[in-house]
Structure formats: structure tokens, C-alpha cells
Amino acid sequence: MRLLRLTTVIITLFAATLLSGCAISQPSITEEETLPEAVITENGSRVFGEVGETAAQYTGEIQIEGLGTFSFDPFEVKTVREDIFREGYFSLFDVLVHLEESGEIVLDYYFDHEMNTYVISSLNGHGNWWYNAFYDGGWPERSVFRMDHYPYKDKMTLNVVPVTEDYLYSVYDTYRDEVNRFRANDGKVIVPEVIIEGRNERFVFENVEVKAHDLRPEMFQPGVVTAIDTIISLGDAGLITYDLQWYESIGTADVVKSYWVNRINEDESRGRCGFVYEAGDEQFYFFRGNHNHIPSDTRVINSPQYVKYFWICI
């Protein structure tokens, strides 16, 4: 692994009130509760809980602006990204492909190697389509995450909407930058800047090589890199320690089924305070499109300009 360089260590108080409402509250393990058995890594980090049944089981719906709402059986949807998803799992884009194959819509699309994503040329004769989506317990939010990377889950809301050509092309430009960065690094995912802003500490790491750890082997093909691999890779290098916790549900969100980062070094989630994250290009930082409620263990990354984990209280 390339040497990771710690460039900044400062003490900071994070203005959590400014970020109120931007993340689902995470429960934490209290002193009265019994910790589940943990897998301990070589550097002393811990992983609590195991992956359960996560494939979609129930009839889903997709709303396409101007065309109406369509129902689909998740057992009938197949993925076009077999390089990313295992059998039984699929993306938001795959739902559109399924509707096209079922004769319910007319979808023209192609794979763009320069962006590593499928592009919609037209849907029922019209171009420039994007999506609004959120998981159970969430709310509408802007996202610039690749549609064919975004895992579908039970009880999620999925809307396909027209956008301006300028907006769509600005998103596509960041995809090209990621692919160019990936190729320039000989097929390695090397993130120029990884930022951790905890309750008590702030770290900035430069040129972090992020390796796949196959934390979600039931969903993703071996070697697929996700945002949470950033934290695990820093742990492998001895630069941080962490706790990961599997959650079946969180608060009003019945369908979570993901690992969350509960601790980084001495900062551990408590009550309504904990870590959230974002990843992508600086052009779409925070609510511009990079900060959304895709759990970091299911957010596939190519070579984003930055990954940031930060502390909030809601």
C-alpha cells in the first residue's frame, strides 16, 4: 500500500447544530446492553454483527414523471452491472431496463467506458433523465451518485425525472475525472483527500489507496470498493482504529441492513451524535449531491476527489 501521509491534526469543535437533520440517527450500545460478539482486526478495530438477509423481497414501485407509476417484482429484475452486483441484487437503473424489457417503456441506453456508467439516450422519445431516490425512513435529497451503482432496497422511493442538459453534463464531467484518475493510478483507487472530522479530532490524509475488503459479499462482486473501505484501509495502515456495527433497522427506518461506522479513534457514537459521510467531487459537496443516505458499505466508489466522515448531532 502506498504510504499514507498525515498532513493535519487539529482539535476542533464541530458545529453540529448547523447540520441538524442531515442524517438518520444511529442508536449506540449503552453500558446496560450486552455487546454482540465482535470480529477483532489486527490493529484492534472491531466489527459487530453479521450480514443478514438483504435481497429485496417485496413488490416495488417506480414513478416516471409524465408516464405514471409502475410496479415490478424484484425477483424478475436482473442487473446489467454483473461486474458490481451479485445475482439477486440490482441497481435503480436496472429497474428501468426491466421495464423496457417488459415492454412498459421504450428505453435507449448505452455503456460509456469513459464514465464507467450506463447513459440514457432517451426514455419514450425524450432525453436528459435523472432520478430522485431515498431509502426507507429517508426523505428526498439531491444525489449525483451513478444510477447503475445505486443498490435497490425494499421500501425505497424511486422517481425518474427530467433535468437540464447542463446539469447532467456537469455530473458526467465528474465521472470522467474519476475514470481518468483511476487509469492514471494504474487501476488503483487512490483518493486525493480523506477527511475525518470527529468530535475531538480532525485528520486529513492525502493520496489514500483504498482497497476492497468485501464487507458485503452477498451484494457485491469480489474486489468492489465501497466508501467504508476508506475507513478500513486507514485502519490497515495503522492510522486509525474504528468500530463497525451492523444495523437491521434504525429508528423509523425498518429496512437499513448495513454496517455503520460507530467509532473512529476515541470518538464513539452516543445517543443522537455520530459519524456520517460524503464522497465525490468538490463541485457537489454536501447537499449539492455528495451527501446522501446511501450507507457507506453499499456506496461503490470509483476514484472520488475526496471522502469525508464527519461528526454531527441531530
Task: Label the model's feature ranges.
Residues 1-9:
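Bacterial N-terminal signal peptides that target proteins for export
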Residues 8-17:
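Sec-dependent N-terminal signal peptides
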Residues 16, 20-314:
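Ubiquitin-like/PB1-type beta-grasp interaction modules and other compact soluble beta-rich domains
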